[in-house]
Amino acid sequence: MNPPNIDYVFWPASVRRYSFREHVEAAAAGGFTSLAVAPETYRRAISSGSSVAELRTIADDNGVKLRHLDSLTDWAPIRVPSEVNPELRERFDISADECFAICEALGLETILAVAGYDKGVISSDVLIDGFGRLCDRAAQSGLWVDLEFMPFWGLPDLAAAWAIVDGAQRENCGIMVDTWHFSKGTPDFELLRSLPGHRLVSVQVADAMKHQRGSTLFEDTVRFRKFPGEGQLPVVEILKILHEKGHLRHIGSEVFADEADELSPAAAGKRSAESLGRVLEAAGIPRSEPELRSKAGGFSERRPA
């Protein structure tokens, strides 16, 4: 059995062109229970004149918990890949100190650790040590750390991520399974089934066509993802495996796509929720309360006292 209260996470890829306020609006429109916040989103909000109190009030007023940091690369000696677009450079080239300060300011509960280095440039011993140190620091603040693999950079697949998590042997960490990265890289279903469930508590859900549409895998992932259930990837099968392990706590939609960029925040949030709901139902994952839903009523905003 999975935990009774699943956290439905809005990873704001589908509203990447918008500000923090619109990210909250999208999450609320879809009835998501929490929001992931990128360091650069926080930076921009603060530099535009918003206070931390105002950001937290906006989220609270709309029933959206600020819970996840997306993302941190400063656990490894290299935090930015050699070839990356300006948007991701802005996200990745941020110190661990700043990331932890953001977590403290917003009251976040989890950190998404990403490999911002190229394949084969850092030894496994260095990576295991660096990840372990990150987990130790996170544990001091009661934070959970998920390690995400991506097929086009230095941590390409589930096996590589498991080698680090298993090698680090920390209690407050696991692996983020992104259905796109898993399917487009080395989709090892046997390994996925064999891993301990307590290390697989989080999943990001996105779909795609089986064939590569972009000139590179990276272009494919940032331009041509599809909403869950609208493509050809084995999304439901992945979700079934994770659900059967009984430890899923965080389930979220993450759709980077040119198509999604054309949607309003509210429309993106609702479509994310509706499409995610359909694949969860197909995977036999029961809805928990508060139920993922399209929210009635408009976006709420007020200034803190």
Question: Over which residues does each language-model region extend?
Answer:
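Active-site-proximal loop/turn and secondary-structure-junction residues that shape catalytic pockets
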Residues: 14-16, 39-41, 72-75, 115-119, ...
